[in-house]
């Protein structure tokens, strides 16, 4: 039995690809036809890839693995953050900062700075500072929360990343490839399948399509590990990957 039915894929519009002028020839094997200037994705192949990808996610989750959710395009931001929070997984929905994976040690210093500022404000000690400094520190805190708040509990490199639109998130995919971190992706007809380890060929623009795939992944994580905000923290204590990998690659 498949994790997702053909009916669900059709109703969510997963089969609608990009305009034929926007495509990657390497994606050809997942295309069924072209109609009115739009590529139609072969949902039979999508179903096979869903089973393969979701089997991997289920197995990884049962072993305590951590998946970093990435979706910075407008249609994906809210959905990706919601499912990541529901499962306790780290996420990036604002902008991918170069080095988030390959220079993770430096990224941790930004997270530590955010924690320091949070303590300053929450303790009330911020009121001991001059008004101009309070405003400056408040802006810094807000900026750090926006960019690294979703990964603040990520104490080591993730075991995999899930990406909505790997073409847009090309830097995240490149960093994961460089470190040997598996990439799971909802990928449209403009994507390069060769840089994706577990591809779900489908519409990565439509909200219903993004929601169907991302929510089902969330369900898998909850079912495998019970869900909750502590899921990622537990996973951080397990697995073989550490931030030392990033340092080795940088060296």
Swiss-Prot record:
Pfam families: Ribosomal_S2. One of its GO terms (cellular component) is cytosolic small ribosomal subunit. GO terms for molecular function: structural constituent of ribosome. SUPFAM superfamilies: Ribosomal protein S2. It comes from the Bacteria. GO terms for biological process: translation. InterPro entries: Ribosomal_uS2 (IPR001865), Ribosomal_uS2_bac/mit/plastid (IPR005706), Ribosomal_uS2_CS (IPR018130), Ribosomal_uS2_flav_dom_sf (IPR023591). Keywords: Ribonucleoprotein, Ribosomal protein. PANTHER family: 30S RIBOSOMAL PROTEIN S2 PROKARYOTIC AND ORGANELLAR, SMALL RIBOSOMAL SUBUNIT PROTEIN US2M. Belongs to the universal ribosomal protein uS2 family. HAMAP family: Ribosomal_uS2_B. This is Small ribosomal subunit protein uS2. It comes from Deinococcus deserti (strain DSM 17065 / CIP 109153 / LMG 22923 / VCD115). The lineage of its organism: Bacteria, Thermotogati, Deinococcota, Deinococci, Deinococcales.
């Amino acid at each position: 039995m498949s994790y997702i039915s053909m009916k669900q894929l059709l109703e969510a519009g997963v089969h609608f690809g990009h305009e034929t002028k926007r495509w990657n020839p390497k994606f050809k094997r997942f295309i069924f036809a072209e109609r009115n200037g739009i590529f139609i994705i072969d949902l039979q192949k999508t179903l096979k890839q869903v089973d393969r990808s979701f089997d991997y996610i289920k197995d990884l989750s049962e072993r305590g693995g951590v998946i970093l959710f990435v979706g910075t395009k407008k249609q994906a931001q809210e959905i990706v953050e919601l499912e990541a929070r529901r499962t306790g997984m780290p996420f990036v929905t604002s902008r991918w900062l170069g080095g988030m994976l390959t220079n993770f040690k430096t990224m941790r210093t930004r997270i530590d700075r955010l924690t320091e500022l949070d303590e300053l404000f929450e303790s009330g000690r911020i009121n001991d500072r001059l008004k101009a400094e309070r405003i400056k520190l408040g802006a810094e805190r807000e900026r750090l929360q926006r960019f690294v708040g979703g990964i603040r509990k990520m104490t080591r490199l993730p075991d995999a990343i899930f990406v909505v639109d790997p073409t847009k998130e090309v830097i995240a995919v490149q960093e994961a490839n460089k470190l040997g971190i598996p990439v799971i992706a909802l990928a449209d007809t403009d994507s390069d399948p060769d840089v994706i380890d577990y591809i779900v060929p489908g519409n990565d623009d439509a909200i219903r399509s993004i929601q169907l795939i991302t929510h089902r992944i969330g369900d898998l994580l909850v079912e495998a590990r019970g869900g909750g905000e502590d899921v990622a923290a537990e996973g951080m204590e397990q697995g073989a990957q550490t931030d030392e990998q990033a340092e080795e690659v940088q060296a």
